[in-house]
A protein has these predicted regions:
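Conserved helicase motor core of P-loop NTPases
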Residues: 1-82, 92-94, 202, 209-213
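C-terminal accessory regions
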Residues: 87-215
Length: 215
């Protein structure tokens, strides 16, 4: 998974340049959140430094294990006020209140929310997100790891969901053998549909399938 993570970062950098630096145009999806370098948490650390590197001029907020910067792409992780679990926004302001404590404003498009320090646990970076969290969303470009170390999550429905989030192109990072496993496996009790054929068709449409030793 380490080699796959490197390839994902390289693809992300290339696609970000093509998107004029707009991270909303490129989304990395992973079936796993933790316990792998190709999971959501580990990938976010890499991708954030590509999309929004530290700058001496840019305001940032060190809060525990998190460091937020102006321009960061973040996701709300629970329902609150008019912001829903899974909503993605951008950090637009980091400031200090009169009492000296910091606060941070996130723009979600239709809504803006001001976060205090105790609210930050409701946020996580969103350069990479889980396939599950991506349901109902669409992105011009999707990058999706498909590795044998993901075996419990190598399922037809999961990868069909991930692949079909892409409006323009999708990059599958891993191996064709891992993809074959995903196509052959489905949820217990899931109806017999045309998902296998559709996922093969979507995979054929992709621009590039890099092979990795991690697969």
């Amino acid at each position: 998974d380490r080699e796959a993570a490197k390839i994902i970062a390289s693809l992300y950098r290339t696609e970000l340049v093509e998107a004029d630096g707009n991270p909303d145009m490129v989304q990395v999806l992973s079936p796993y959140r933790v316990n792998t370098e190709a999971g959501v948490h580990a990938l976010n650390k890499q991708l954030r430094e590509i999309a929004n590197p530290a700058s001496v001029k840019a305001e940032q907020w060190n809060a525990g294990s998190w460091t937020f910067r102006i321009g960061d792409k973040v996701m709300q992780t629970k329902n609150v006020d008019n912001i829903s679990n899974g909503d993605i926004g951008r950090v637009v302001q980091i400031s200090r209140k009169k009492d000296g404590n910091r606060q941070m404003q996130v723009d979600f498009g239709d809504e803006k929310r001001m976060y205090q320090e105790e609210d930050l646990e409701d946020l996580e970076f969103a350069y990479a997100t889980s396939v599950h969290k991506s349901q109902g969303a669409e992105y011009p470009v999707v990058i999706l790891p498909v590795l044998k170390c993901f075996y419990p999550m190598l399922r037809r429905d999961i990868y069909y969901t991930g692949i079909t989030r892409a409006k323009t192109r999708v990059h599958l990072v891993g191996s064709k053998s891992a993809l074959a496993i995903a196509i052959s496996r489905t949820n217990i009790g899931m109806r017999n549909t045309m998902l296998a054929e559709r996922i093969r068709a979507e995979a054929k449409r992709q621009e590039y399938v890099p092979q990795t030793k991690a697969a």
